[in-house]
Amino acid sequence: MPLPFGLKLKRTRRYTVSSKSCLVARIQLLNNEFVEFTLSVESTGQESLEAVAQRLELREVTYFSLWYYNKQNQRRWVDLEKPLKKQLDKHALEPTVYFGVLFYVPSVSQLQQEITRYQYYLQLKKDILEGNLPCTLEHAIQLAGLAVQADFGDFDQYESQDFLQKFALLPVAWLQDEKVLEEAAQKVALLHQKYRGLTAPEAELLYMQEVERMDGYGEESYPAKDSQGSDISIGACLDGIFVKHKNGRPPVVFRWHDIANMSHNKSFFALELANKEETIQFQTEDMETAKYVWRLCVARHKFYRLNQCSLQTQAATLNSVRRDSSSRMSLPKPQPYAMPPPPQLHYNGHYTEPFASSQDNIFVPNKNGFYCHSQTSLDRTQIDLSGRIRNGSVYSAHSTNSLNTLQPYLQPSPMSSNPSITGSDVMRPDSLPSHRHSALIPPSYRPTPDYETVMKQLNRGMVHADRHSHSLRNLNIGSSYAYSRPDALVYSQPEIREHPHLTSPQSAHYPFNLNYSFHSQSPYPYPAERRPVVGAVSVPELTNVQLQAQDYPAPNIMRTQVYRPPPPYPYPRPANSTPDLSRHLYISSSNPDLITRRVHHSVQTFQEDSLPVAHSLQEVSEPLTAARHAHLQKRNSIEIAGLTHGFEGLRLKERTVSASAADVAPRTFSAGSQSSVFSDKMKQEGTEEQEGGRYSHKKSLSDATMLIDSSEEDEDLEEDSSREQAISAVSEPRLTAAFSQELNYPCASATPITGPLHIFEPKPHVTEPEKRAKDISPVHLVVETHRPRRDGLLTPSMSESDLTTSGRYRARRDSVKKRPVSDLLSGKKSAVEGLPPLGGMKKTRADAKKIGPLKLAALNGLSLSRLPLPDEGKEVSTRATNDERCKVLEQRLEQGMVFTEYERILKKRLVDGECSTARLPENAERNRFQDVLPYDDARVELVPTKENNTGYINASHIKVSVSGIEWDYIATQGPLQNTCQDFWQMVWEQGVAIIAMVTAEEEGGREKSFRYWPRLGSRHNTVTYGRFKITTRFRTDSGCYATTGLKMKHLLTGQERTVWHLQYTDWPEHGCPEDLKGFLSYLEEIQSVRRHTNSTSEPKSHNPPLLVHCSAGVGRTGVVILSEIMVACLEHNEVLDIPRVLDMLRQQRMMLVQTLGQYTFVYRVLIQFLKSSRLI
């Protein structure tokens, strides 16, 4: 078809990645190796860092970050919260990003993971060689001797030390003088001989300990000028912020605990000291530099504050027992014509770790129940020294083997790959004892092999089929690092191998075959030429060897392992995975982790994501059918029909409502028909699941294509379905009335009580249907009934009748109130934030279109007259994965069910809602709003005083139990000028350690909360309220929230306490925050401070309540409390029933979560939390 205006487009067969939608991030690692990742243009620096961490199998990512050279050729750390592409386009000199250590530690004993220590060693060595860390020549030679021993092993493996001439020994400052280099090489050779016998981890440890004692360790400085105009260098170090003068004056260090606040203004960077009422300013080059220095120092301070406790308590004891079996070994001398490779076998677990990282425990049951972690490959390879074997993918899946639980059989390690940062070794097979299963365990972070190289080696007979490990059943991808971080970007295919019966003589003594695998890379750690680009995703090595499956039945393995199916890949996947699956015609069907996981994608997403590999799946199908054994038949949660037609026949069983139930369901029901249809539906679902159990796998999808539920969970579901059938058969007549009453409630469901969530109510209110369902049902089958509405119809979320103008009148003295009475009486000020004025309920046709048909119908008094859909009518099950929960929440938002759900929750108690104390005339002026009052049985009672003889404050106790853990809150209004003394009395008497403030002092020119704590840095940093003296000790701004440390002193007794004040500063005047990650970080800060205070508090006040307040103490306060409780439900895998929890909260304080917008915001927060933690 011709284009208009005579335009012609050039037709090509090339596919070009558009720069507008993709970013190829080129990242240089600490060993000078380059990796590339294909990311989205919106991918943040954090996502790129996590991709690198996955590539390295690095879990302790806290200490590392990414940096680049700016256009002035200066190093700048990437802002991890912002898109990487925008930062590089705006500031970077070149698109290359570098991986390195950002936060240094006082002692390497803090580093738990071996790969973390190794990367840390590489960073320190780079700092020395590049001259970033100044040192003397003698010190550099000593460090070079340790580095040679760490990287090359014992000196007697080599005929001469000439290779040291090509090894980077000294800092760049001395590389120009050949005489100095020659003398230094001789001294290094002598030191190398002196250090003979040291293993690589021991040499690296000595190297890092030497560097730790050097001046300038962990420092990063920038040029600036002081107040006198003198040139200085200012930067951050371990202890604080240092200032080095260039005129010979001694350096000055401002320690972290002496710094009260840091700020920047234009090109000035300022420090506010806690002990002195002064501010020290420094002038940087420009405004961007001042902001960057401030951001870096704030990050260093936060790292110091969060880690100072753990730094003091961590032990640095060596585990000498594990060293014997997991240390790196020196290698024999290779053939004389070849340059000897660096003999470096990385050890596992040099320090005592909370998890086992060696195969030593493979025969011993783990009694402490810690997470056991294997990064090893026990696959011995017949090696020809004329070639190199590189085995392993970019990311090796971890194995739990038989470490977590005592099992009746011994299971060999999966054929996990061993990608490494530096080189490894080639060892003669005859030099290895075949009976030692754990003496040679290389780490699992070695370079990715080229697929063609592996195939050539296979063709040359370098890999023998009878020497492979033959188990893949326990490839625990879910516990690996790639699934423990949010939004991981890079995925690799695990190596899938099948093996015949073990016939070799050395394997007769053990029920598994012990194999070894060693790898090598370029012999020069610092080559002159550029390293080849290493792909971000490896090609799986698929070996055609027959499977021996009868020794280890898959169902037994699945029962003995604690398994959580990993979440699906996000769509669209940022990282490109390019294995040619169509060439691999044989793939193991013995691994339940790879082929039995629940499908989480929708049909459309599944089709779009999976069509490119349809051809390869068809080819894979038949070998799988042939290799399948009878006892390996497992239920499949999906059916794939018509694979050659583009997966049009994909049917999700668990999401499908049977046609018979749909046809039977009319528009309206009588009570009896509702109950019968409900029970029939359950029976049909159970029948479907039982029929599904007869299916066995005939087609397997790639792990990057789809995920299917494991057999263990299928069995549990089958038992649950049969149990529910029996329950429904017994309880059907009794549930008729209760079920018919609340049929329209979107979250009504029949659920066996497991006791995940408890409410502490002084006076419980249970209706008769609830009592009958609880008392009569033999297994406590409860239909989630709620209190009947006044008229059974939907009501607006907050109407003006709920907040009458007469109710807003408060008898306040003129000297106390901060606003004119006309504002109160005119309705301008309301406890409801963002509420339209009176008469604003009239909608134009355009407005009606905006609010959607469901909301419009509800506002006109129409309610649902159909059975709720499966996803609507039940809370999110505890068995659901994070991705399923996220999908259900998103569906409720998209379908408008959140609105209906919110409108059905009572705003106040209908019975026993007494507020008699709050309505007393003497307490009227203590209420910010006359219609937001605490219930008598839930209010916080103060010790009566002469000024407050009733002990009243507008605050309510809120208690909720999640998974046996009690969450205790105090929800209160923002203090008034005349209630500050009562506020601090409540803090003292209730033992409050954390105050969460979710408002500003003023918004839109109106007071939201009186400032009840003193400002930092002012002359009056101490204020007294009655018997309490409050002092501000420090304040830290962290973007969307500020953390302030307060000292509270009781003047009569002299006792002092520390109170943390966490103020969320990013809430807009109207609506809710847009930055969901920022709000989640605020909740994380609350959790972090709560853990800190609980660990340091006295046992009698081990769990003090969290005090939360906004202006009225119901809107934003309810959002914080509800969000934190629901996040706790997600973390403890409890039932996710948001409306029920909110109803519980409102039974303790009225009108919590005031508006629909706030309620929707809670959903968005939970969705963001699930998306961020879906890979954990």
From Swiss-Prot:
Family matches, as Gene3D superfamilies: 1.20.80.10, Phosphatidylinositol 3-kinase Catalytic Subunit, Chain A, domain 1, Pleckstrin-homology domain (PH domain)/Phosphotyrosine-binding domain (PTB), Protein tyrosine phosphatase superfamily
Positions carrying Phosphoserine: S577, S589, S590, S637, S673, S710, S711, S799, S801, S806
Domain FERM: 23-308
Domain Tyrosine-protein phosphatase intervals: 898-1169
Residue numbers binding substrate: E1069, C1110, S1111, A1112, G1113, V1114, G1115, R1116, Q1154
Gene Ontology CC annotation, any one: cytoplasm
Composition bias, Polar residues: 796-807
Enzyme Commission number(s): 3.1.3.48
Chain intervals with Basic residues compositional bias: 809-819
Compositional bias per record (Basic and acidic residues), positions renumbered to this chain: 680-694
Compartments where located: Cytoplasm, Cytoskeleton
Catalysed reaction, written as an equation: O-phospho-L-tyrosyl-[protein] + H2O = L-tyrosyl-[protein] + phosphate
InterPro entries (UniProt xref): Band_41_domain, FERM/acyl-CoA-bd_prot_sf, FERM_2, FERM_central, FERM_CS, FERM_domain, FERM_N, FERM_PH-like_C
SUPFAM superfamilies reported in the protein's UniProt record: (Phosphotyrosine protein) phosphatases II, PH domain-like, Second domain of FERM, Ubiquitin-like
Keyword terms of this UniProt record: Cytoplasm, Cytoskeleton, Hydrolase, Phosphoprotein, Protein phosphatase
Function: May be involved in the regulation of growth and differentiation of liver cells.
Stated name of the protein: Tyrosine-protein phosphatase non-receptor type 21
Species in which this protein is naturally found: Mus musculus (Mouse)
Source lineage: Eukaryota, Metazoa, Chordata, Craniata, Vertebrata
